[in-house]
Design a protein with these regions (language model features):
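An N-terminal hydrophobic leader/cap segment in hydrolases
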Residues: 14-60
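Positively charged, low-complexity intrinsically disordered regions
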Residues: 6, 24, 40, 47, ...
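Alpha/beta-hydrolase superfamily serine-hydrolase fold, recognizing
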Residues: 54-60, 66-331
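Residue-level recognition of short loop/turn positions
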Residues: 8, 64-65
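Single conserved hydrophobic/aromatic residue that forms the stacking wall/gate
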Residues: 1-9, 13
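Intrinsically disordered, low-complexity sequence elements enriched in Ser/Thr/Gly/Pro
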Residues: 3, 21, 37, 69, ...
Length: 331
């Protein structure tokens, strides 16, 4: 009976903690995007004491006259040393082309260093991160074209790491997931190269976060879980030049009439995320069009969970799916 009492007390305590956490989340979940303030908050992540231990090299790829910075993260010391050895062959190496999130408006490679370094370490693959141009200074499709130019250089062997195209995987979170999905559609349409695999982590695939949205998660999860529907609407308004942009499938991949001939796709969504349903719906459309697709919903997770520490259960669960997918296994 003592055990039952302590178990009941524990349940009450957990409920109180959950209610307190929910109140804090709700208080932090405000609408409106103040570009400068949001960028300043994002930039605080650069103060990372682990930075000096990351094995990385900076390069540039040109999009016309614009130099697109990229950063290569190495999975271990050996691969880092080999990068300086001109006789070393990287063709059999594997590589993730990473596109960061941030609503097309904030974030940078610097802010995502920990995530990229961890991605290289946890998968054993090279990671190449793209510093694409941000809105509102550079609106759609500037950032996407930067990502396309970098992908084209990698897939056509015009990059410092000459990796076989079939060994390259696109990966992005949130707005980065949107850019990866759009990049795959663009690659199919332009015919210059074609990604074999893509990993979309809680991607944005639609163009409306008002009450008109057809996706229930926008209403269910749009006010109390940090990323609000109001913020998402602000982000897409900052990213688009006009209303016409918002109807472009490269802006909102879910709107593409034809989603056939797309890469093998892994989609990870968060349970408490306004973007949950549109990410899963895009996956279902890809599957119906004959593509190989895996969709996994991370139970209990909020949008942005992938930035949590490597020991976090949601992150570990994600890497289980990611590594199985990269090895061609289904879970």
């Amino acid at each position: 009976s003592t055990l039952m009492r302590s178990s009941a007390a524990s349940d009450v305590y957990k409920r109180q903690i959950n209610q307190a956490a929910k109140r804090i989340l709700k208080a932090l979940s405000f609408d409106g995007v103040e570009v400068d303030a949001f960028r300043h908050m994002a930039d605080l992540k650069r103060l990372d004491p682990m930075k000096i231990f990351y094995k990385k090299i900076d390069e540039k790829i040109y999009n016309g006259s614009h130099a697109v910075p990229v950063r290569i993260f190495f999975p271990n010391e050996k691969s880092f040393q080999e990068s300086n050895d001109k006789t070393s062959d990287s063709r059999d190496k594997k590589l993730l082309l990473f596109v960061h999130g941030g609503g097309w408006v904030t974030e940078s490679i610097d802010n995502y260093e920990r995530i990229c370094a961890r991605l290289a370490d946890a998968t054993g693959q090279y990671v190449v991160a793209v510093e694409y141009r941000l809105a509102p200074e550079d609106k759609f499709p500037s950032g996407l074209e930067d990502c396309y130019v970098v992908a084209k250089a990698l897939y056509t062997g015009k990059f410092v790491l000459n990796v076989k195209p079939e060994n390259i995987t696109l990966i992005g979170d949130s707005a980065g997931g949107n850019l990866c999905a759009a990049l795959s559609l663009m690659a199919r349409d332009r015919g210059e190269f074609m990604p074999k695999r893509q990993i979309l982590i809680y991607p944005a695939t639609y163009n409306d976060y008002t009450e008109k949205s057809p996706f229930p998660s926008v209403k269910e999860n749009g006010t109390d879980y940090l990323l609000t529907a109001g913020k998402m609407q602000d982000y897409i308004d900052l990213y688009a030049k006009n209303e016409e942009d918002k109807q472009n499938p490269y802006f909102a991949p879910y709107l593409a009439k034809d989603v056939s001939h797309q890469p093998d796709t892994l989609i990870l969504t968060s349970e408490f995320d306004p973007l949950r349903d549109e990410g899963e719906a895009y996956g279902k459309r890809l599957k119906e069009a004959g593509n190989y697709v895996q969709i996994h919903r991370i139970k209990g997770a909020l949008h942005g969970y992938f930035a949590l520490g490597i020991k976090h259960l949601y992150v570990q669960e994600s890497f289980t799916y990611i590594n199985a997918f990269l090895k061609g296994e289904a879970l």
